[in-house]
Amino acid sequence: MSEKVSVPEIFGMNVFNDAMMREHLPKKVYEELKNTIERGEMLNSEIADIIANAMKDWAIERGATHYTHWFQPMTGITAEKHDSFLAPPSNGRAIMEFSGKELIKGESDASSFPSGGLRATFEARGYTAWDWTSPAFLREDAAGVTLYIPTAFYSYTGEALDKKTPLLRSCEAVSRQAMRIVRLFGNQTAEKVTVSCGAEQEYFLIDKNLYQKRKDLIFTGRTLFGAAPPKGQEMDDHYFGSIKERVACFMHELNVELWKLGVPAKTQHNEVAPAQHELAPIFEDCNKATDHNQLIMEAMKRISGHHDMTCLLHEKPFAGVNGSGKHVNWSLSTDDGQNLLDPGKTPHENAQFLVFLCAIIKGVDEYPELLRLSAANPGNDHRLGSQEAPPAIISIFLGDQLQDIFDQIEHGGATSSLQGGRMRVGVNTLPALKKDATDRNRTSPFAFTGNKFEFRMPPSSASISGPNFSLNTIVAEELQKFADELEQAEDFNAAVHELVRRTYVEHKRVIFDGNGYSEEWLEEATRRGLPNITNSVDAVQAFLDDKVVELFGKHGVLSSIELQARAEIRYEAYIKQINIEAKTMLDMASKQIRPAVVKYAGEVAQAIIAMKAVGMDTTAQEELLQDINENLKLLHEKLKVLEEETERAGALQEDNKTQAFFYRDHVFKAMKELREPADRLELLVDENSWPLPTYGELLFNI
């Protein structure tokens, strides 16, 4: 039985949060730091030294010996280098020091991380810079206790080399433009608008011993071979089902660690596929939520090992059952407590809500390629549009009530509501909107769910920075256009009504409340002119589109050079991932599957000879051997094809884009063709002779 835990006592105990700062810092220093955080100003060196010393003392009291600048390079995972607090010994005695300079800035080898050409190998210098909007924290593990300082990562010449920098820039951009709208509606108390975010994290748990017997899982995170088990998810008995004790023990330890780190882990349950689960936190500031999601994924992978399990975060670890995604819930809130996507109780609030809603609708319609790119990676190519995840077509679900209101506005003004009630916006009447007046459409990639939007496309293994900074920047752009127009209006109420009406009429093609899985929607989306980008290689082009380059440059989120670098990194990552998968398939097929099948076929042949010698009928055995031999021959042929295509891909002297397309069109195709005979052979060969743990063992042996 797990030990009893008092969540209020342990929550945030390993975080140098506001309470700890107030306790450990002089009042004047604390107030100056708070002002710096709230206003986004620079921190002077004297104050930094005091903060660093207090942070060090707090960490050492908790047993820390080292600190690290924790950053998020373009690998999609986090990076860290640990330094001890030990200063040069004096008179043979150890001294523990930590200066403001060490807190604020660090140095790392930028050439060893993906840079897309921004850094050559001989241009190694890169810097980490303290992000004081995300609190430092302590991590306890086998190495002891370490102070983690969230940081941004940039090059010697100032280009962003990480996921955090554009996110922070985009949060400032959307706050700047949202405040203009808020001011127009009379709010004089708010100082900034923050992006609220919460990411629902899906994952698989499998037995660690079985995991270690699968090279594909070890090297690629997904199974490259595997026949369907007798039972999958068709009984619908795993979703929200009783949580197995072994998994529950893992979840308990995970929750305790996350709560100590200030991560507001809230919901846990079984997901649709066997061995699949989900953790969802309470929504919080977008920057913290992004850091916390990285902590969640890292903790899942590490803590699963404590229970002899392995956590799989890949988007599609098993064919034939649902893969994993990450639903990103997104909204905007003022610092005086107003959710700008919450339909209000007064005409004033409802008008403001509709303006923000229209900005999002317009932005999603004008920049669908960018949102699609933000959800693109090789693993997600297996999910999107496959009857288990949203389609690759970007559309918005609003629900019947909002749809009805917009339809009425289009034709002159809304005077009734599907839910009843009325409201006034100036001289125009609109019905009152009630929270949770929308149903849930699980097939929609971008759905309004009462007081937030739920972006359901992002990959389970990826950082949520990309979806967030893309959406933030898109909305900042549309809010800027709206503010420019409304600030010049002579009749504000009339201008708001016309803006809402015009925006809906011009962009309603992106709104779809039906079944996103249907073939009819694919045809309808084509008629509407909505892009259907089916794979991550095609999606990368969005980084280089003129309108996207202009968008990010205009709002100071990413420069054209930084965007070009990110495109190169995406192409290169795809190449490397598919190359690793192809080589793993070649290794497994030639060294494990083929030898096992040959050996088993020999045993069957010997059995046929022995049975014939005593006059027994061998029809069944001969048919079995014939099936095995035909599939073994096909396996051998497809193995050679994949080997040739992989060699051709590696020998290409073209740019990364051309090489990535070759891997997609030739290598990936050859991989699928090799898998087919291998999976058929699994069903023909004695299970004791098959060299790999089967899907049945992997999915149901927890």
Q: Across the structure, where does each feature detected by a protein language model lie?
A:
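Hydrophobic alpha-helix feature that most strongly marks membrane-spanning transmembrane helices
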Residues: Q72, S90, W259, G305, ...
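Active-site-proximal loop/turn and secondary-structure-junction residues that shape catalytic pockets
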Residues: I47-I51, F71-P73, K101-E102, F153, ...
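Glycine-rich, acidic/polar active-site loops that bind/position phosphate-bearing ligands
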Residues: R125-L313, N322-G325, L332-E568
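C-terminal amphipathic alpha-helical interaction region
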Residues: V500-I702
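Active-site core of metal-dependent hydrolases
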Residues: I10-A124
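Short linear, low-complexity motifs centered on an aromatic residue
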Residues: G76-N91, S108-S111, R214, G221-T223, ...
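Histidine-centered catalytic micro-motifs
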Residues: H69-Q72, K326-W330
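Catalytic pocket of metal/acid-base enzymes, prominently hydrolases
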Residues: S2-Y30, N44, G126-D131, P135-Y148, ...
